[in-house]
Amino acid sequence: MSLLEFFRPQKKTSASLAKERLQIIVAERRSQNDPAPSYLPQLKEDILKVISKYVDIDPNMVDLTFEHKDDDISVLELNVKLPDDEK
């Protein structure tokens, strides 16, 4: 390796540039689309049915959210406000 090659930046191949650009486009489209899966409303109803077997609960007191943290990580968060008294 000569001294000039050390200070000169390495040129990226057109294939690697195309791959990087495609990854950026795919990531943008994933974030723009509806990130929530289609089964979430049914999942929320099923969870409500199970909880209501044990506790009287208002369906408006259940909050189900879904979000993508990274390409590999998705978070499903369920918040249920339970009443003070049990069934």
Curated annotation (Swiss-Prot):
Pfam annotation, one family: MinE
GO BP annotations listed: cell division; regulation of division septum assembly
Protein origin, superkingdom: Bacteria
Alphabetized SUPFAM superfamilies for the sequence: Cell division protein MinE topological specificity domain (SSF55229)
Keywords in alphabetical order: Cell cycle, Cell division
Stored HAMAP family: MinE
Family the UniProt entry places it in: Belongs to the MinE family.
Free-text function comment from the UniProt entry: Prevents the cell division inhibition by proteins MinC and MinD at internal division sites while permitting inhibition at polar sites. This ensures cell division at the proper site by restricting the formation of a division septum at the midpoint of the long axis of the cell.
Protein name, entry field: Cell division topological specificity factor
Organism the protein comes from: Vibrio parahaemolyticus serotype O3:K6 (strain RIMD 2210633)
